Amino acid sequence: MRVDILSKEYPPAIYGGAGVHVAELVRALRGRGDMTVQVHCFGAARDEPDTTGHPDLPELASANAAVQTMGVDLAMVAGTEGADIVHSHTWYANFAGHVASSLLGGMPHIITAHSLEPMRPWKAEQLGGGYRLSSWIEKTAYEAAAAVVAVSEGMRKDVLKSYPSIDPDKVKVVHNGIDSAIWARRPGPDTVRGHGVDPDKPSVIFVGRITRQKGLPYLLRACRELPPEVQVVLLAGAPDTPEIKAEVEALMSDLRTTRDGVVWVPEMLPRAQVTAMLTAATAFVCPSVYEPLGIVNLEAMACELPVVATATGGIPEVVVDGETGWLVPIEQVQDGTGTPVDPDRFVADLAAALNEAVSDPDRARSFGLAGRRRAVDSFSWASIGDRTLEVYRSVLGA
């Protein structure tokens, strides 16, 4: 069996959970002896065997970003000839999978749903008119796909809600995973101090991109209520738009007028530095208003951190309230934005959960150890590779 994986992100160019998923899934599948996996990704040429990078087309340099994406996708299609299955990840690569399958090669197209355009209307802020194009690409590809892999039960429900014409039997759940050998507690006090954090003082830490869905503005407001000795550490980069970047910067400046120990690392750090920063923290916080699963929570749990996270999307399938962390309740406006119905209440509940986490170190450590056990036992990439292979075989009738 030959499977061609189509993705915007692939090492070394990874900036989100979808990229982590693709990299780890490819590694798990290539470890098997009964299949060949070829990767087609955006960007520069890769040295990795059976992996092809596809740069932006210079002829489309002045075009809308979504049109540029379509150009790269079309460049990918030619390389899929001879594949038994094409498997695309995110709308950025869905067009390539759809063209290869439905219009050219005839092989089955499988899509992994990491996020959905109808559930992220704020992307119009980033893509402009291209949001209508990305939404059309996603809808067209999903409705024609042989199977859709949802990364959580919550995502499966969202797929069927967003695209009700899809046969529910075609939508399978295969969770994201974690490499618990790589993601583990590894003290690095020099690294931590080098970023301006005192490893001997309590801290709450956020890791993620600066996007609407990650809920950073709510977190920055909630952190006003933390005890003064608690540091606030934000490993937050890759802003979607100048607008969200400016909003976060303004809230950060305001928070710094009320307390010391607010540390913002605006670039995406190497994994070894992230694990050192996680190891030094007291609790991890994920204030997302939209999160299909949240690999970042698994990464924190694997590093033995208790997690304070919003009870939305697939997060409750990872974080067990009262066992591995605290789930913060949220009632959301049903317009696709994930906006809290009562933002002040959400901020207050988030602050209360964070205060619980930092006020009882023994309980926090207990939750962290339980989180590590859960990550190891339930979310290994080997098992996720096996379950993905089952989906491949089902569409091939093997």
Question: What label would you give each PLM region?
Answer:
Residues 20, 202, 206-225, 246:
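A conserved mid-protein helix/loop that constitutes part of the nucleotide-sugar donor-binding site
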Residues 45, 178, 231-249, 263:
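Glycosyltransferase donor-sugar binding loop
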Residues 88-93, 113:
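Short His-centered aromatic/hydrophobic patch
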Residues 107-108, 118-140, 157:
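Nucleotide-sugar donor phosphate/pyrophosphate-binding loop at the beta->alpha transition
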Residues 154, 177:
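Carbohydrate-associated surface elements
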